Amino acid sequence: MSLDRKINRIQFLSGNSLKVIAVLTMLIDHLCKIVLQWLLSNYWGAMADNGQMSWERFREIDYFIRFDLQSIGTIAFPLFCFLLAEGFQHTRSKKRYIGLMLAFALISEVPFDIGFFSAYSRMEDTFPFYLKYQNVFFTLFLGLLTLVCLERFSCKSDLPVDRIKSAVLQVLSVVLFSGIAEGIHCDYGMQGILFISAFYICRNHRIYQVLLFLLAYMGATGNQPPLCTLLAGLLILLYNGKRGKLKLKYFFYVFYPAHILALYLIQVGLGNRSHNGFLPQCWKKVLH
């Protein structure tokens, strides 16, 4: 029995299952970055300074948030890239798919900017806009354009010269859109283009998809894949090729800007309550 057939026997995760896992792990990551790191910077450090909390305890919390919790969030992006490549193959209208991605990239930009970069945009007097970094939908949009080129330049001839020409054009497409993603500072940048391309190029062999994805990770970062990135690869191996019963087609599109805005409002609410002395008293009880 071939390796692909052995893997097929243990696949049980639908596309909806992967999407839910990706959304939950992304939520954990963004909760850390928007709310918990803000508390770390604005309150827990001050509490350690004035003796309300030990520095050892502060460092434990800092490590837990920045490394343990946020590492869970690294599972999300490879799953979204994989689902994008899958969606590209099965969509009825590629133009509509690309247009939808661009529309939500524009819709999500203000929530993304105020959620992650409000302090910087206020310093630069550009609030609520922060033009130096773009949300992940722009990365996915560029990824779709890359897939259009990969499909357009795929070789349908057995002639060596045609195969070489096709390969060169495909590589140049990946390089071009990777450069654009880096140039406009999209979230994940070149990594996103490489991941999406890897999942599409090896679309007929799941094990090769995951292996090329891991190679793309090492090529983009220069590092060995961490545990949670390997876990993302394992989850992709367990994908059964089915969409699932629930209709979650547009859920992520809406959830992405909505949850960032909600987390930012929580951050603002915590800041307002701090003026009444609520936070120092509350966290003193929690952290001791």
Which residues does each PLM region occupy?
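Alpha-helical transmembrane segments and their immediate juxtamembrane cytosolic regions
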Residues: 1-288
